[in-house]
């Protein structure tokens, strides 16, 4: 310590502080350089930024025993500056110790990994993670599985036969009903206890079924093509269609019952159309074809024939023999005079009807055209039921409700039907079951089928019977006759105007075409006259030939302008 204190210049003297500081820095640098030369094992020089005094640096170079302190200082500074020292004996020893520590850490980690494989909870505990202790399930006592021995039945008994059938096929059917199958003999015996009732036998195929519901389903699914017959072996079409409708509702489709045909249908009309022609030869199909009695063209359906009749031969009219009794009174043929109406007259009536509908829509736009053409029920092909009558006050109230709330509710108690128009509410009240009014149904006069709505019966007559739902009335009213006379006058005037315009256009086209032949004929006539004059006698007067030469120039001038 004395040597260190003696080396330090304690007395400042007259020199300034800057000079003292510079001398200290220079002395420290020299001492560090000497230390690095003396000890080759330590080659690191402390940078000049450190705040060591000159005395400490000078004393570090005197003995070797004091060098350990400087070495410790240098390693400390090296660690602070993150600089790796050179390889020395001491450093090598420290490196070996560190390697041993790393190996120990690796061994510990391996042991932890092995423990984690066996018990994964251990690793979480080592790393300080909290984990709830899981309740270990109680180990179940491992009982020996005893293989059941096959049951033994008496030789030749029914149980033995059933058991052999189960082993062979997987199930055995009930010997009573032959419809139910079981996989065990116990289950079969339990079924046979309840299977002692009388069986339901299908009268179509002879199959026996256990329940009435099963029999109904069997008939509906497999025998839906068999028609329902009346007393005289006639097909009852309304009940037959109703039965097919229920089959279609439950099964979702109608299946053709021919073995060679696998067609299915989702509509009754398509099914009936297919059944009528399925499995029949071409000759039989030709007999079933409907032929037009005007031109003899064959059609497969009534709808196709009706469309052909309307488009090619005017409206559809059936002869007197095929007309039903309920429509004979409304026949279109004249009864009093005994004269049969011709086809051209029928077509004229049809066209008059179209003209009348067009004129009525122009003259009375708010009035229904069909109501004017078919005013009374005697000319309809269906009957209308009685509809309820409403007072003007009720109708006015309903109209105001529609303007305010845009809807009307049915006035009957318990009915929640809502409509957006008065006509819809009227139609609903005619068929509402919660009210006091009991209304009938719309009935088709051609097949006596009933419908709930008028649009339904109209569609039925047009599609099924391929006819109009009303009969055209050949006798017209006075207003209708006036309208037709006015229409005929307008048509005649239009025709006259067209003819007059055509004549004028033809005259205009013929005038420029006729002028050149006249001009060509005149000089020829002059030449002939000149020749004749020469023959007859000398009369040289070429006066008419000169003005004719000027005319072709005019024609050429006109052509140039064109």
Swiss-Prot record:
Zinc finger (C2H2-type): 200-223, 290-313, 442-465
Principal location: nucleus
GO CC entries: nucleus
Cross-link Glycyl lysine isopeptide (Lys-Gly) (interchain with G-Cter in SUMO2) residue location(s): 18, 84, 230, 335
Record flagged with keyword DNA-binding: yes
Keyword Disulfide bond: no
Listed Polar residues bias regions: 12-23
Similarity comment: Belongs to the krueppel C2H2-type zinc-finger protein family.
The protein's name in its UniProt record: Zinc finger protein 512
The organism of origin for this protein: Mus musculus (Mouse)
Gene: Znf512
